[in-house]
Amino acid sequence: LGTQQSSMFGDSTHDGVFAMWYGKGPGLDRSIDAMRHNNLLGTSQHGGVLAVVGDDHAMKSTDVPAASETMFADLQMPMLYPASVQEIIDYSLYGWAMSRFSGAWTGLKIVADTVDAAAPVDGDPHRLKIVIPEFAFPDDGVHIRGGDRWVLQEPRLRQFKLPAALAFARANNLNQVVMQSPKPRIGIISSGKAAVDVRQALMELGIDGAQAADQGIVMLKMGMPFPFDADAVRDFAAGLEEIIVVEEKRRFLESRVRDALYDLP
């Protein structure tokens, strides 16, 4: 919180400070009160906060098999889920930019299988072209301010900050179709490490990209599971015969996919 207050008192020497919080699943549990209040208060215009949570599904180094998506959703905090070592770097940069733009903290879920891996990465700081979308913010903005009224914080978060995060994700193609077909029949929706596992499973079944396209298999990889982009899912689902949702631990994406598609004409 202090980093985001640095420019509020007229004596700062920098335009803003961006910050990172890190904890494993149990650490997130213990920090909920502070994070909920800080997400409601918001970030500074030139700051931003990235909340990195390590989910250890196999409990190799923690005492609970955490799955933090539901916690981020309850906090109403935008969350990104990188699928590779390269994406940990990329999504961190996107996450800070999203936090700065939307006025909300941004969560980053990482799992042991990814963060314990070794891989070559492109470290060029100018490789990413972050797009700042057009968005109709309220006249008084969405960032942290002194004397903020508590009763206004939740409406500001729900009506502006989360939609702004969604607009940012769309502008930067964080939810993208990674497998395409000229005649799509079967759609797979996944996120993070599970999306990598799906691709690996298909390869082990002898189904490469060309064969998947020929069989009508397409895949939507949700880089931002929350806030959930229902429009992206509806566009992806158009014309499909069947949709398979692959995710870890909880029915987080599945229930939202069902709600987005239920009772469509």
Question: Would you name each region that the model predicts?
Answer:
Residues 1-100, 111:
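Thiamine diphosphate
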Residues 82-265:
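Flexible, low-complexity linker and terminal segments
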